Amino acid sequence: MGSYVPSSAEEKKSMLAAVGVQTLDDLYASVPESVYLKEPVIPEGQSEMEVISKLSGMVEKNTVYKSIFRGAGAYHHYIPSIVKNVINKEAFRTTYTPYQAEISQGILQSIFEYQTMICELTGMDVSNASVYDGASAAAESIFMCQERKKTKAVISGTSNPEVIETIQTYCKSRGVPVVIVPAKDGQTDQAALAEALTDDTACLYFQQPNYFGVMEDSETLIQMAHDKKALVVMGVNPIALGLMKTPGELGADIAVGEGQPLGLPMSFGGPYLGFMASTKKLMRKLPGRIVGETKDARGGRCFVLTLQAREQHIRREKASSNICSNEALCAMTAGAYLTAMGPEGLAQAAKLCLSKAHYLASALAGIGYTPVYDKPFFHEFVTKTPIPAADAEKKLADKGILSGLPIGENEMLWCATEMNTKAQMDAVIAVLKGEE
């Protein structure tokens, strides 16, 4: 506990003497009094009961919706109780990076199993131990595709706007040119894409399903990019992968996505995790930690951090990225979730999302909230709103329902997951019809 105990009076006196002053006021003599804090930095200490009471009052200011129909990157999914029980184990709740394999086999094995499941989910050869979130995973993947004469990144305009902004921010600092391909009828405009794909194109990034919930023509987009010898980065929803073809089966080179649906609560925006997986050919360009399986001195199975020459503790500023230890707990949460659900459970969750979203879309269309895009969708979709979208949002909020996300004056992006009951969806219709 010594490191948590403030310096004693004698220690302070000794330190002041070492720099040639007698008091703290002497030490800060060069600081103008006009910038001095007049109030204490923190209040006086309080009892545990007083602190809990104060924090409870702060929490009560939040609006917590039990009925949620909003996605747009963060999704309300059921989290099996076993997931929390596993990750709350003291051995996992640490920010320590497991460099010393001989004392970290439990954490290393857990991360290895997470990587294995991400590879199975995406159909790829190798996965890292995750990065900060889905947006940073997408941006990092762009750098994996860079070559000396092929640097341009082509991004589908149907991608999540926040992901696009993150990619642009990352690429600006490295001088990587970015071209945004416009949307057409809710999908990537293939004619515009054909123009954007030139000989200097390093990669194409698109999402499946895209921001509007619409399913893209993945095979065509991938073929168009490969015809120009560009790599393909596919942003995917991990729950949707319970039903759809994997990026590996479709021919993508890199698969990335937001891992929040895999057992992480929405938590006002974080912490989340970004999963990344690629073909073996691109393995050495993957950022972040990679755990590998090997044999110990006795020939037994063991786990280590492998391919470490890519990382910042060896290559410093030339490392492929600067990903720190905090993501390990989120990755292990996703691993625990995938283990608890299994392939059949994940497929069942995906089927429920699909069926409930289509039920909601049909019910909304019946009261004038018609689909904007007549295209296949998974669990998100855009509707027109006969009243301003902000007004529809408020009507539902007044009844304790979080509506879809207004994305235009008269357009709303809806989402339904396995958490939404028929009664909740019928309540949405009743409120919008003015029956409640």
How does the language model describe each region?
Residues 1-37:
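Compact, charge-rich alpha-helical regulatory domains located at protein termini
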Residues 262-367, 371-374:
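Active-site C-terminal subdomain of aminotransferase-like
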